[in-house]
Regions:
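Alpha-helical cap/lid subdomain in secreted, periplasmic
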Residues: 185-313, 325
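Serine-esterase "nucleophile elbow" of acetyl-processing enzymes
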Residues: 72-162
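Acidic/histidine-rich, surface-exposed loop or edge segments in extracytoplasmic proteins
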Residues: 108-118, 198-206, 344
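Sec-dependent N-terminal signal peptides
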Residues: 4-13
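Conserved catalytic region of serine esterases and O-acyltransferases that act on ester linkages
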Residues: 307-380
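Conserved SGNH/GDSL esterase-like catalytic core that processes O-acyl groups on lipids
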Residues: 126-216
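Sec-dependent signal peptide cleavage junction
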Residues: 18-106
């Protein structure tokens, strides 16, 4: 009996163990099923990711479309701005050409030394004569103006003398120390190669200054010749505009009257500047015409000493102021307003002093601001 009882108990225990095993197995199966279910959820996530990628792709496409549209807009805006800038430049150039507003971009700025070659005639001497007084007054010891002088020399003659190499010129230097003759006889070709000039100024024979055909093609050819032999890396070319004769000058009959001569000069110079390599104009002719409109400056014979050449003091100072404001002032960042020189003796007619200095400076500065028009503000 006892054995049977023990056998029954053992059998019961076996059955209980099998049940537990099945329960565990079922649990594993459930876990596996759960895992399987979990694994089956992965495609769902993949679908979500695919949707996200599709959304991102759409967004990228939209951004690219927007960027392309923006790029086209930017390009259109850029082209419009470029066209507007180009038109503004053309209008500015046309304004400078029509009115003569000075454009000083070609000039050197604040050089250690400024060397200017002035190729001309007696009118060039008149323009330079008062420069030493101004330069000395301002303490400017680093400016030299070399004047290559041949009396009554025209542009055509300058060209012919260059080709022939004739030594028919005199060479002068003007600086803060005064005037000195460097050579009694020299040629234009030799002097062109003497120094690395920063600026070269040309002057026409006064009687022909209102005739454009007397300028070209001679001036352009001389500029070409200079460019071949020049020592400087960059040279600015300027032209000194001649003044009209006094109303009683004998040679004025060619132009009928003074005002017409001045207008003819302005027309010829403006046309010459457009056709040649001239960078800027020194408007001495307009400065003189401004001064002739000012009652307080009506001395000598309309600012001339013989009807054609400028008067020795007020006239020469006026020309020097115009030269200074056109060339030296923008290069060296100085103003003619700083000058307080007294030019001439108290007994000299037209002496420059505190009574007329500012008026003469005004006439010069107004001409530099507008090369081809008489200013209503000259007397202020």
């Amino acid at each position: 009996m006892k054995r049977l009882i023990w056998i029954g108990m053992l059998f019961a225990l076996c059955l209980q163990g099998m049940a537990q095993t099945n329960k565990t197995t079922n649990g594993q199966t459930l876990v596996v099923r759960k895992t399987t279910v979990t694994k089956k959820t992965v495609p769902a996530n993949t679908t979500k990711q695919g949707s996200t990628k599709q959304t991102q792709a759409k967004q990228t496409t939209t951004k690219q479309s927007t960027a392309n549209a923006s790029g086209k807009t930017d390009k259109t805006t850029f082209n419009q701005k470029t066209a507007a800038d180009t038109q503004a430049q053309k209008e500015s150039a046309a304004l400078q050409q029509s009115t003569g507003y000075l454009y000083n971009a070609p000039l050197p700025y604040l050089p250690q030394k400024l060397d200017v070659l002035f190729i001309g005639n007696s009118f060039s001497i008149d323009t330079s004569a008062a420069l030493p007084s101004i330069l000395s007054s301002l303490g400017m010891n680093n400016v030299n103006v070399y004047v290559l002088y041949k009396g009554g020399c025209s542009m055509k003659q300058h060209y012919e003398f260059y080709k022939s190499g004739e030594k028919v010129y005199e060479l002068y230097r003007y600086n803060s120390q005064g005037e000195v003759q460097l050579e009694k006889t020299t040629s234009i070709g030799e002097v062109m190669q003497r120094f690395p000039y920063d600026v070269v100024v040309w002057q026409q024979y006064s009687l022909e200054s209102g005739d454009y055909t007397s300028y070209e093609p001679y001036l352009s050819k001389l500029i070409q010749a200079y460019n071949i032999t020049k020592l400087s890396a960059r040279t600015t070319f300027a032209f000194n505009e001649t003044w009209a004769y006094a109303s009683n000058a004998k040679n004025l009959t060619r132009y009928k009257n003074q005002k017409n001569m001045w207008k003819s000069i302005c027309t010829a110079v403006r046309k010459m500047k457009a056709a040649s390599g001239i960078d800027l104009v020194i408007p001495c002719g307009t400065a003189v015409q401004n001064a002739r409109e000012v009652e307080a400056l009506k001395v000598d014979n309309e600012l001339t000493r013989d009807g054609t050449h400028i008067s020795n003091y007020a006239g020469r100072y006026l020309l020097a102021c115009t030269f200074f404001e056109s060339i030296i002032a923008p290069c060296m960042n100085r103003s003619i307003r700083e000058d307080n020189t007294t030019y001439g003796k108290s007994t000299d007619v037209g002496q420059v002093n505190d009574t007329n200095r500012r008026l003469l400076q005004n006439c010069a500065r107004l001409a530099v601001a507008n090369n081809y028009e008489i200013s209503e503000f000259a007397g202020q």
